Design a protein with these regions (language model features):
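Positively charged n-region of N-terminal signal peptides that target proteins for export
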Residues: 1-4
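Hydrophobic membrane-insertion alpha-helices, especially the h-region
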Residues: 6-17
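N-terminal secretory signal peptides
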Residues: 21-81
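Mid-chain, structured segments of secreted extracytoplasmic proteins
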Residues: 65-105
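A conserved hydrophobic position in a structured secondary element of the catalytic/binding core
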Residues: 66-67, 122-124
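Domain-length accessory/inserted modules outside core catalytic folds
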Residues: 94, 105, 113, 157-160
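Short, solvent-exposed interaction modules
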Residues: 101-121
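C-terminal partner/receptor-binding element of secreted or periplasmic proteins
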Residues: 123-160
Length: 160
């Protein structure tokens, strides 16, 4: 009986190991291969910095992709009439989508983001670790304000 039990448990463990397990949608799985940034038109070559915005117009919904968090902030600011259902960012260290309410941003010009802003979206645990290490960490609103200042310091204020 003991031998049969061990054999049965071995089979159960092997089956459990072999069965597919659910996983979070990886960012690279969710960004279409031909996606271009809705703001600057660049292809989304590095999904670690990608962002997306789900917008609606009546009954229709669309997903806008961005190559850099800064482009999403710019698009948000320059298109105030959009009905935004969700803003999501690829968060580090393991790229996956997270809603804007659940992310923070590391601000560091040395981070090589596609548009050079140096904004890296991270989850709460990573934000706490980075803040404790002395790095600059901003909320969604703080990162949006940083991007606005970053753009205006380089290109001037937009004309009304």
């Amino acid at each position: 009986m003991n031998r049969a039990f061990v054999l049965l448990m071995s089979v159960v463990v092997l089956l459990a190991w072999a069965l597919p397990r659910p996983r979070e949608a990886a960012v690279t799985d969710a960004v279409p291969a031909d996606a271009e940034c809705a703001e600057c038109g660049m292809s989304i070559a590095d999904a670690r910095f990608a962002a997306r915005m789900i917008v609606s117009n009546g009954d229709a919904e669309a997903t806008l992709y961005f190559d850099d968090a800064g482009c999403l902030f710019d698009h948000d600011r320059w298109h105030p009439g959009l009905v935004v259902r969700s803003r999501e960012f690829a968060v580090s260290p393991k790229p996956r989508w997270a809603r804007s309410e659940a992310v923070a941003f590391i601000v560091d010009p040395k981070i090589g983001t596609p548009m050079g802003t140096g904004l890296l979206a991270v989850d709460a645990a990573e934000a706490a670790r980075r803040r404790a290490a002395g790095e600059r960490v901003e909320s969604f609103e703080g990162a949006a304000a940083y991007r606005k200042h970053w753009m205006e310091s380089r290109f001037g204020k937009p004309k009304p």
